Amino acid sequence: MAKQLSREQGITLRGSAEIVAEFFSYGINSILYQRGIYPSETFTRVQKYGLTLLVTTDPELKNYLNNVVEQLKDWLYKCLVQRLVVVISSIESSEVLERWQFDIECDRSAKDDGAPRERSQKAIQDEIRSVIRQITASVTFLPLLETTCAFDLLIYTDKDLAVPEKWEESGPQFIANSEEVRLRSFTTTIHKVSSMVAYRIPFLD
C-alpha cells in the first residue's frame, strides 16, 4: 500500500505535461481578465491552487483556449515546446504593448515508463500559486491599457515540427522601448517554467 501511495505522489512525464498545460490554461485566463482584454462579465470564478481564479465563459474564446491547451499538452509530453508568449497589442495601431513570456525547459531524459520523480503535488501547486498571484498583482505596476486591445498566443517549438492546421508561423512581436519584470518560476522536476512580462514604457507628454 505504501508503495502504491508513493507512486501516486510521484511525477511522471505525462502527469507533468498535464500540470504545466493546466497552469497555462488558468494563467492565460488570468492575464486576459486582469488586463481587461475581454469584459469582466464574461468571466466566472473557480477555485484552483487554493485561490479564486477567473476563467472565460465566452464560447469562442473557451473553445480556442481548450484547443491550444490540448495541443500544448501533446508538445509538452514530447518535449517539443520551448516557450509560450501572450502578446497584447492595440487593435487601433497594432502596436505591441505587453509580452508575457513563459520559457519552458524539459528534461529530455524523462520517460513515461521510468520511475516517477520525487516531487509532491503540493510543492508544485505552491509554486504555481505564487506565479498566479504575481499575474494577479501585475495591475499594480503595469501601465493602464488605454486602448482596446487584442491578444495573440505564440508558441515556440522545435524547428522541424510540422505546423498544425489552423496554426501559422509568426515573428517574435517584440516591444520597442520596453521594461521587463521577471516573475517567479515553478518546476515539476521534468518541466521548468520561468516567466516574465515586458511592457511598453508610456511616452510622457
Question: Which residues does each PLM region occupy?
Answer:
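Long protein-protein interaction modules used by eukaryotic assembly/scaffold proteins
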Residues: 1-63, 71-205
